[in-house]
Regions:
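Class I S-adenosyl-L-methionine-dependent methyltransferase catalytic core
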Residues: 1-192
């Protein structure tokens, strides 16, 4: 797995053996293509990566110039991998700020927000119920974590997901990438 673009382009990232299911390079490339079409570039962007795994999504955004990247991951082995991957990406001196929150996503979204985010990427373990993901989204909405018109991307298994957006969000599109589907939605607080 490599950083696709930006100042750390080509850097090989470590993965967590067995504990996580990394987003495929194809899906990651498509995700960032969608984000670029939405935002133009990553300058000034604040991104939140929930269930960070290897940190590839957040670190890709950092490499591309995001101003602030926060990753939330509770697994200790994954945290070490994210820290090691950050050190690799940081050798190229990306301009943005980075912070790893070593806690559960449920705890993170129950605490006061650390920032307001333009982009949130949520990639929970496949055994997470859709209702649990919808609860996290509701807490992002009611907790004040999101900038108006924030873009949310939720990765779920293509096999059994009945994912739907809760109040405060509008579905934009969904795309299948092998075993995964990424659902895109906009934060629309006036609708919730």
């Amino acid at each position: 797995m490599r950083i696709i673009a930006g100042v750390a382009k080509g850097r090989t990232l470590g993965t967590v053996a067995g504990a996580t299911r990394p987003t495929s390079d194809r899906a990651r490339e498509a995700l960032f293509s969608s984000l670029l079409s939405e935002f133009g570039d990553f300058l000034g962007i604040h991104l939140l990566d929930l269930f960070g795994g290897s940190g590839a999504i957040g670190l890709e955004a950092l490499s591309r110039g995001a101003s602030c990247v926060h990753i939330v991951e509770k697994d200790v082995d994954a945290q070490k991998t994210i820290e090691n991957n950050f050190e690799l990406v940081n050798k190229n001196r990306p301009p943005g700020k980075f912070h790893l929150y070593s806690m559960s996503v449920q705890r993170f979204v129950s605490d006061p927000p650390k920032d307001k985010y333009h982009i949130v990427y949520i990639d929970p373990p496949y055994e997470f119920l859709d209702s649990e993901v919808e609860e996290i989204l509701s807490k992002l909405h009611t907790g004040g974590f999101l900038k108006d018109d924030a873009l949310i991307a939720v990765e779920r298994t293509a096999k059994r997901s009945n994912f739907s957006w809760p109040d405060g969000f509008t579905a934009v599109r969904d795309r299948n990438y092998g075993q995964a589907t990424i659902f895109y939605g906009n934060y629309t607080p006036k609708n919730g």
